[in-house]
Amino acid sequence: MTWNYRVMNRGGHLAVYPVYYDESGNIHGRSEIPFSPEADNLEELRTTLELMLDALTEEILEHESVPKQSS
């Protein structure tokens, strides 16, 4: 399973969420809450923020239309 960050609209508010895909590239699920970046060092934080910025180039998803990731 692969994943990336995607912007989601939830009640008129935009946030970045991790989104998970199945082997065919279809959306399989999302995290329950938006992602808040943390890192052990500046380079790690930079990499995470760059991945989050990539989400701004993708279509905005509606939060309600993407199922929560199951355990």
Where do the model's predicted regions map?
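Short N-terminal "domain-start" leader segments
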Residues: M1-S24
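Low-complexity intrinsically disordered segments
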Residues: T2-W3, F35-P37, L42-S71
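Buried hydrophobic residues that stabilize the cores of well-folded domains
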Residues: A15, V19-D22, H28-S36, L42, ...
